[in-house]
A protein has these predicted regions:
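Mature extracytoplasmic domains of secretory-pathway proteins
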Residues: 56-125
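C-terminal motif of bacterial Sec signal peptides marking the signal peptidase cleavage site
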Residues: 15-16
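Disulfide-rich extracellular modules and peptides
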Residues: 19-20, 59, 86, 154, ...
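C-terminal partner/receptor-binding element of secreted or periplasmic proteins
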Residues: 126-182
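Residue-level signal for mature regions of secreted extracellular proteins and peptides
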Residues: 10-11, 50-51, 77, 145, ...
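Sec-dependent signal peptide recognition
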Residues: 2-8
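N-terminal secretory signal peptides
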Residues: 22-83
Length: 182
């Protein structure tokens, strides 16, 4: 009995520590009714790209409900989608800092072994960011994925006369890009 209570406490602590930190829950849609616990659902969350000021990503993913979710023993499906949009009049970033692919979102999708992640990739020649969402496991991940691309030229172009830029910065569409120092 003590072992069962200990496992329940441990799983509750892990559930409290997990999740997509730094996200705002936008909403959810119920997909399957469960008599015990929450219903299976699709959740939508928003989070700002930590290195690109003015870009917000929206992610939707399947969330398993029921009694297993209550004790954090469920395993969510690998179905997810991501979309990123401009949410400020101008976008600013340092090209050196975003040059390498980076994980910008991570959320546990099972008790221990499965995670849902969003990776950001940057194409410097086109000034385009690609965001890919996928899930993985310790042993084997899933090939299911979704991606979105965001260009500096998507929004209204900045007026160079009205925007102050530093000598190591350039304006590309709605983006102010800080270039590497030589």
């Amino acid at each position: 009995m003590k072992k069962a209570i200990g496992m329940l406490v441990l799983s509750s602590l892990l559930a409290a520590c997990g999740g997509g930190g730094g996200t705002d829950k936008i909403g959810e849609a119920s997909t399957v009714f469960n008599m015990l616990g929450k219903n299976d659902r699709i959740e939508i969350h928003a989070f700002d790209d930590p290195q690109i000021k003015g870009v917000t990503c929206y992610i939707s993913y399947a969330k398993k409900g029921g009694l297993k979710e209550t004790v954090n023993l469920e395993e969510d499906a690998s179905d997810a989608s991501v979309s990123c949009v401009q949410t400020a009049p101008q976008i600013t970033f340092n090209e050196t800092e975003v040059a390498k692919p980076q994980k910008i979102f991570k959320k546990g999708s099972s008790f221990i072994f499965k995670t849902l992640q969003v990776m950001r990739y940057y194409d410097p020649a086109r000034k385009v960011f690609s965001y890919m969402v996928y899930s993985d496991k310790v042993i084997q991940g899933s090939p299911k994925n979704s991606m979105d691309a965001f260009s500096c030229y998507t929004g209204a172009p900045l007026d160079a006369a009205k925007v102050s830029v530093q000598p190591n910065q350039q304006i590309h569409g709605s983006c102010i890009v800080t270039l590497a120092q030589k």
